[in-house]
Amino acid sequence: MDATFTAEQEEIRRTLRELLLKRCGPEEVRTAVQSEGGYDSALWETLAQQLGLPGLAFPEAYGGVGCSVTELALASEELGRSLAPSPLLATAVLSVPLLLAIGSEDQRAALLPRIASGELTAALAVPGASLTIALGLTGDNRGDWAGGGRAGGVQARRTDDGWRLYGQADQVLDGHSAGLLFVAAHTGGFARSRTLLFLLRSGSPGVTRVRLTSLDETRSQARVQLRDVEAELLGEEGESSDVAGVLASVGDSAAAVLAAEAVGAADRVLERTVEYVKQREQFGRAIGSFQAVKHRLADLYVQVQAARSAAYYAAWATAAGEERVGGLALAQALEALRITSSEAVQLHGGIGFTWEHEAHLYFKRAAGDELLFGPVHRLREHAADAARLFGGGEVAV
C-alpha cells in the first residue's frame, strides 16, 4: 500500500475544501437543511458539473470520472468537515454501485450519465428500518430483514406485464427528493424468500414519500410507502443476481466512505475547539494553557488520527479488492467523532450548549450515524464474528 496521495487526489481535497469554505459555512448549512430538498441545489450543481463528484467513482464510458472509492472517500472527508448536506451518499455511494453491479447495459447507459451530470439523484430504499442489516454491517444480510407478505417489509409480485410492489421502507436517505429509487423487495410471502432490486422513477403512481424529522438534520431521511406500484426490475429478466452479496459489498465500501466523512467532521470540530481554547480566558489566562485541557485535546488528536488511518486503509482496501474492513474503520471513526464532538461541547463552555453554535451539529451527526449505520459495538461484533476471532461459525460478509 502506498500511503502517499497522488497529485490528483490532493487537488480533489484542495478544490473541495476551498469551495466549501466559501459556500458551506454553518449558516449556509442551516439554510440548506430547511429547504424543500434538504440541501443546497446550486451547490450540488457546482459539485456535479464543475467537480464531477456524483460520477467520481464510475467509468468514463458512462460520463463518470473513472476514479475509485479512495477518491470518493477523500471527497467525503471534505464534505464531512463542513457537514455539507448533499445527495452524494445516497446517490454515488449507496445507489450507483448497485446499478453498476446488477443493472443491465441499457439501464446503465440511460441512468449513469444523468447521475454524473447531477441532473438525477438516487436513493436506496430497504424495508422497515433495517439499513445497517441490509448492508451487512451489523449482521448477516441473508436473513429476514426484507420481510415480505405477511412478514411485513416490501413484497414484489409478478404480473403479466411486469412487477408490482407493496410495503414500506423507512430511513431512506434523501428519499423524499431522489428522482430514482432502488427498492429491495421480497418475491414471496415468507421471511426468507428471494430478494430482488427494483427501480422506481419519480412520479410513479402509488408511491407516497414523507420526509421524516431526524436527529441529524444534515442527513435527510424519508418514509416511502408503496401501494400496487409498477416497478422495473434492476438487471435483466431471468438473470440470477446475488442481491445480498452485492448489498454487503456496497455496505463495506459505503462504510469506508462514511468513515472518511466522520474523520473529516471530527478533525474540523477538533480544530474549532483548539481555536476556541486559545481565546477563552479563565483566571487570567487562556484555558488552552492548562495542562488538563492540553491532555484532553492531545487524546482527541490521537483518536482522530488513528481513525483517519483506519478510514484511509479501508478505502484503499476496497479500491484494491482486498479485505473488507469498512465496518471496523467506520466503528473507529464514529467513536472518534462522538467523543470529539462531545468534548467540543464541554470545552466550549456555556456557548457550546446553545442552538446558535455549530458544536451540537457535529454531535448530532455522530449520534445520527450511529443510529443509521451502527452502533459501534455491533459493527465491531460483526467484524469479530466474520473473522471468527472467538471460535464462532462462518459468517457471510
For each of these PLM feature ranges, what is it?
Residues 1-80, 102-105, 114, 118, ...:
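Alpha-helical interface subdomain recognition
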Residues 125, 168-207:
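A short core secondary-structure module
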Residues 118-137:
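A short, Trp-centered hydrophobic/proline-enriched beta-strand micro-motif
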Residues 136-142, 171-172, 201-236:
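Flexible, small-/acidic-enriched active-site or ligand-binding loops
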Residues 86, 105-112, 121-123:
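Short secondary-structure capping/junction motifs at helix and strand boundaries
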Residues 120, 150-152, 177-179, 193-194, ...:
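A generic structural signal for well-ordered coil/turn residues at beta-strand boundaries
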Residues 86-106:
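N-terminal glycine-rich flavin-associated loop
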Residues 154-156:
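A structural signal for short hydrophobic beta-strand segments in well-ordered beta-sheet cores
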